[in-house]
């Protein structure tokens, strides 16, 4: 069949809207009609050419929601008509990682997914002249129709709006999950969130959901103060407006008459800046503070700290897709949204057509959007 898609023909160039060929699902695969897709910084990272693993031509996009229209042989967990969210982190429930119950990083299709291919080593997309087009993060949601492995779709309730729940495919889950699954924040905790973009705001609402008592947001942009407060932030710090070291400032903020050591129980880096990652660790409480690294640093970047920071009880942890097991946890997060436990609507700042998709990247570069969503 043919489908409309925004194709990344080469790095550094705007996406091109065109008709492409899409082959139907093979064994263990499903075809999904994408109804809405978010535009994420990871898509921009690859399109810019900065991603060392970026390959072209490809159909980007990994934050979508849609309806199953066809299933291949052997598919049992979804059927045509089911509403689903594509998963760039699948859940096969059979590989050593899934069976360990210690990680969400399923390895079942990791090798081929990283090459922009389906599990059988081929692509379902091609140009009208037959030139293969690569998949992206196993999803390719910048196409009106896409094909995914069965293990890479989460079935969700049919009454949830596509243009909101698509954000659960990446940003919402990454932020809230880092709090709930990775850090396991408890009621009454003190936390600091570095970087108040879409991920940071979702960390903040995850902290509020978990019952954190003090939620400090750190950002160089004062406009983010109002955004943070909307989602549950209790204090705001702009590092450029304080005297002295931001770590010392944060430690002092978290001191109490009972605890004069100070430091946060949990910190979260949502910036991808390795200097900020160090500050986040060192703003943790001596003896038990945990710093969760969410932001993706540039290729080749390294983190540094003095070993004394770790010897005295601080912990560095990483979190990918919020530690969420996609097929199991994503439907629950959709339920949280539908039950009013978390907010998504305010973060969807722009709704665009496929023809306007490049405007979404422009808005991101200008810092004018939290999340732009393309609706098909």
UniProtKB/Swiss-Prot annotation:
Cofactor stoichiometry and binding remark: Binds 2 Zn(2+) ions per subunit.
Residues reported to bind Zn(2+) 2: 92, 95, 98, 106
PROSITE patterns: ADH_ZINC
Top-level taxon of origin: Bacteria
Assigned keywords, A-Z: Cytoplasm, Metal-binding, NAD, Oxidoreductase, Zinc
Broad enzyme group: oxidoreductase
Similarity field: Belongs to the zinc-containing alcohol dehydrogenase family. Class-III subfamily.
Role: Oxidizes long-chain aliphatic alcohols, long-chain hydroxylated fatty acids and S-hydroxymethylglutathione (hmGSH) in increasing order of preference. Shows little or no activity with short-chain aliphatic alcohols.
Designated name of the protein: Alcohol dehydrogenase class-3
Organism: Cereibacter sphaeroides (strain ATCC 17023 / DSM 158 / JCM 6121 / CCUG 31486 / LMG 2827 / NBRC 12203 / NCIMB 8253 / ATH 2.4.1.) (Rhodobacter sphaeroides)
């Amino acid at each position: 069949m043919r489908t409309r898609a925004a194709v990344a023909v080469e790095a550094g160039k705007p996406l091109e809207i065109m008709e492409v060929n899409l082959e139907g699902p093979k064994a263990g695969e499903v075809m999904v009609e994408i109804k809405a897709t978010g535009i994420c910084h990871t898509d921009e990272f690859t399109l810019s050419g900065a991603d060392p693993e970026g390959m072209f031509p490809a159909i980007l996009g990994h934050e979508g929601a849609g309806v199953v229209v066809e299933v291949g042989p052997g598919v049992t967990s979804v059927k045509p008509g089911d509403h689903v969210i594509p998963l760039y982190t699948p859940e096969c429930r059979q590989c050593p990682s899934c069976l360990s119950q210690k990680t969400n990083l399923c390895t079942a299709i990791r090798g081929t997914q990283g090459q922009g291919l389906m599990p059988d080593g081929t692509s379902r997309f091609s140009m009208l002249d037959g030139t293969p087009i690569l998949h992206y993060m196993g999803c390719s949601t910048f196409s009106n129709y896409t094909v995914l492995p069965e293990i890479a779709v989460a079935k969700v309730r049919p009454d949830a709006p596509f243009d909101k729940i698509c954000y659960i495919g990446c940003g919402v889950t990454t932020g809230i999950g880092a709090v709930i699954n990775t850090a396991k924040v408890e009621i009454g905790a003190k936390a600091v969130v570095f970087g108040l973009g879409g991920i940071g705001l979702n960390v903040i609402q995850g902290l509020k959901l978990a019952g954190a008592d003090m939620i400090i947001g750190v950002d160089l942009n004062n406009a983010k103060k109002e955004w943070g407060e909307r989602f549950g932030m209790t204090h705001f710090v702009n590092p450029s407006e304080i005297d002295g070291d931001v770590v010392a400032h944060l430690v002092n903020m978290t001191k109490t008459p009972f605890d004069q050591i100070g430091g946060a129980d949990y910190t979260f880096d949502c910036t991808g800046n390795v200097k900020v990652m160090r500050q986040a660790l060192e703003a943790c409480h001596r003896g038990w503070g945990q710093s969760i690294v969410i932001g993706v640093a540039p290729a080749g970047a390294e983190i540094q700290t003095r070993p004394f920071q770790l010897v005295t009880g601080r912990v560095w942890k990483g979190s990918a897709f919020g530690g969420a097991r996609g097929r199991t946890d994503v439907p629950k997060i959709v339920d949280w949204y539908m039950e009013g436990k978390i907010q998504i609507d305010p973060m969807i700042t722009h709704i665009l057509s496929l023809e306007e998709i490049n405007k979404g990247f422009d808005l991101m570069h200008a810092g004018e959007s939290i999340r732009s969503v393309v609706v098909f």
